[in-house]
A protein has these predicted regions:
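S-adenosyl-L-methionine-dependent methyltransferase catalytic module, highlighting the catalytic core
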Residues: 15-18, 23, 85, 98-101, ...
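Active-site beta-alpha loop architecture of Rossmann-like, nucleotide-cofactor-dependent enzymes
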Residues: 106
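Conserved N-terminal segment of class I S-adenosyl-L-methionine
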Residues: 1-94, 98-102, 112-118, 211
Length: 219
């Protein structure tokens, strides 16, 4: 599957959708910033085009992807081309105040590998650092979860919590219904409407199909 990734993702979103996605992410980061310590480094695993990391406020911004995304990520961001599972070998351990992952864990091969990845995240975090995970929830998405050929592992909020606990990430926040399933779905792409959605929690219960998890690496 790795050799197909560039072709797969290039065909999944056209340039108009990429631009709209960036506008959506600016508003999502506005919401998520409350969980991020701006006085510490942030790492975005599986960063794609850097939709999250380009907007977050932090002393240092790092991004990683198995693909070479340097041309898409702003030059002031430290980009590392590596598998998420090997990051402990190539970036500082115990260094980051926040490690972020979005729509990433479902692409891993097995549930054991999901736990291994979360243990790597725990290893990269400084004491008190936080993992922020946005994750499609198969219980809420249903069969559409498998509409993407590269989805391999099915997770609910409960299995995500269990995996995080096994990785010694202690739950700070769990929002089972947060965002719609994808930017191809029902989340508006106008920035003002996205922010209105994020401020109006009853809408999450109607449209939310992705779970937000925030976990802490305690000393």
């Amino acid at each position: 599957m790795t050799r197909l990734l560039p072709e797969l993702y290039d065909s999944r979103f056209d340039e108009r959708e990429v631009s709209a996605k960036d506008a959506v992410w600016r508003e999502i980061v506005w919401f998520l910033q409350r969980y991020v310590d701006p006085a510490s480094p942030v790492l975005d695993i599986g960063c794609d085009r850097g939709h999250f990391i380009r907007w977050v406020d932090a002393t240092e911004r790092w991004a990683s992807d198995i693909r070479d995304m340097r041309a898409a990520v702003p030059e002031e961001i430290r980009f590392v081309q590596a598998s998420g599972l090997s990051l402990a070998d190539v970036v500082p351990n115990g260094y980051f105040g926040t490690v972020f992952m979005s729509n990433y864990l479902e692409h891993l091969d097995t549930s054991d590998v999901v736990i291994d990845q979360l243990r790597v995240v725990r290893q990269l975090l400084r004491p008190g650092g936080r993992a922020i995970i946005l994750q499609p929830n198969i219980r809420l998405v249903g069969p559409r979860y498998w509409d993407f050929i590269d989805h391999k592992v099915a997770l609910t909020e409960r299995s995500l919590l269990e995996a995080a606990e096994l990785a010694q990430l202690h739950t700070v926040e769990l929002i089972t219904r947060f965002l719609p399933y994808s930017t191809k779905g029902r989340l508006p792409t106008d920035a003002r409407l996205v922010r209105a959605y994020l401020r109006f929690r009853p809408a999450w219960w109607l449209l939310g199909r992705q779970t937000l998890f925030v976990g802490e690496a305690r000393a």
